[in-house]
Amino acid sequence: MESDKIAFKINNQLVSVKPEVIVDQYEYKYPAIKDQRKPSITLGKAPDLNKAYKSILSGMNAAKLDPDDVCSYLAAAMELFEGICPEDWTSYGILIARKGDKITPATLVDIRRTDIQGSWALAGGQDFTRDPTIAEHASLVGLLLSLYRLSKISGQNTGNYKTNIADRIEQIFETAPFAKIVEHHTLMTTHKMCANWSTIPNFRFLAGTYDMFFSRVEHLYSAIRVGTVVTAYEDCSGLVSFTGFIKQINLTAREAILYFFHKNFEEEIRRMFEPGQETAVPHSYFIHFRSLGLSGKSPYSSNAVGHVFNLIHFVGCYMGQIRSLNATVISTCAPHEMSVLGGYLGEEFFGKGTFERRFFRDEKELQDYEAAEAMKIDLALADDGTVNSYDEDYLSGETRSPEAVYTRIMMNGGRLKKSHIRRYISVSSNHQSRPNSFAEFLNKTYSSDS
């Protein structure tokens, strides 16, 4: 019988079947650009900028905006934000601009236009008798792009969180160098009338383009990023969490991965570090690949690397970090096992610093210190024949090497120690847990064991 089949009987008849499950039909797509062309979108005919401003502002005051017209205006307004490229700018082999070139957000991408006219003449704006200033254009652009940030705020945020964010954004765009163009609470009212701006591909594309530009080019109106910053590393929560994790525990990526004692990490680590990506390149298209439409399904999201994501946030919970306690558990990625490993790693890296003298009064004191430290190391390495130094190293609990941590987990039967459980309960029980959060998981799973 084939090794991938199972055998059983039905009504005394032998049956052999091959168990198969549904395969994820959506393949992860990496954002590498292979055709050497800038990311592109197609919009309607470019409007008269001043007429478009009046029409869009009128629609905003009435809390009724047409997404196509908004996108057409935002693309046309890019010409107002000219800046100087600080360095040669390339990404995925594409030359974006040379050092010293005058550039606008439109330089970063390819915006194609059709002959389809927008509904500018029908959308009002007759009450504006003068043409807007650049400061007023900048305020409108900033307010429109802020609809993206508001639409990305999770419903799990309680109270008036979103309203407070909207109010602070309005305050930014009514003070210099911007100009007040709307009444208080207009932004939130407009958002409520259409709360799904982040799902509109062209709007997302333009938000990412503006953010990529203002993140690199020093500009008078760089505060526009307040509404677009959420496009940076969008759908990269797995990779972003891993980056924060290694900084937190003061290890390199290579050193940290040596502590990932589970077979399900293998595929995720391979996925996260696919060759050919510009994950470590500043100002790359990679940073905004999701908003620029370069990937339909991110291989760096929390769902794509769920075991890594779960482990990192269980360690964060052990350390009492609010962000980790509030994060959503990936329930399909072995949360119980990840909580065990997270407990051991949390114990190793929580409240244990690595300290050494680095500054001295003079060169002689430095040399004396180095000589004394070298002598200590020689003595520590000397084997007096009475103790197996290898066993002592791994069983004493005084080392945090991957081998030592793994040995301690195995010696405890792959289970958490009572001290781990007490710590988990201590941090999670004092936290107002959100549905499906790590705090809720720890409370439900370990409260009876404390």
UniProtKB/Swiss-Prot annotation:
Question: How this protein is processed and modified after translation, per its record?
Answer: Phosphorylated by host CK2. Unphosphorylated protein N seems to have a better affinity for leader viral promoter encapsidation. Phosphorylation of protein N in ribonucleocapsid may stabilize the interaction with protein P, thereby playing an important role in viral transcription/replication.
| Further comment | Displays a superantigen activity in human and mouse, activating mostly V-beta-8 subtypes of T-cell receptor.
Q: What is the lineage of its organism?
A: Viruses, Riboviria, Orthornavirae, Negarnaviricota, Haploviricotina
Phosphoserine occurs at S389
Q: Which Gene3D superfamilies match?
A: Nucleoprotein (1.10.3610.10), Rhabdovirus nucleocapsid protein like domain (1.10.3570.10)
Q: How does it assemble?
A: Homomultimerizes to form the nucleocapsid. Binds to viral genomic RNA. In nucleocapsid, binds protein P and thereby positions the polymerase on the template. Protein P acts as a chaperone on free protein N to prevent it from aggregation before encapsidating genomic RNA.
User: What the protein does?
Assistant: Encapsidates the genome in a ratio of one protein N per nine ribonucleotides, protecting it from nucleases. If expressed without protein P it binds non-specifically RNA and therefore can bind it's own mRNA. Interaction with protein P abolishes any non-specific RNA binding, and prevents phosphorylation. The soluble N-P complex encapsidates specifically the genomic RNA, with protein N protecting the genome like a pearl necklace. The encapsidated genomic RNA is termed the nucleocapsid (NC) and serves as template for viral transcription and replication.
Keyword terms, alphabetized:
Capsid protein, Helical capsid protein, Host cytoplasm, Phosphoprotein, Ribonucleoprotein, RNA-binding, Superantigen, Viral nucleoprotein, Virion
The gene for this chain is N
The protein's name: Nucleoprotein
Give start-end of the signal peptide: none
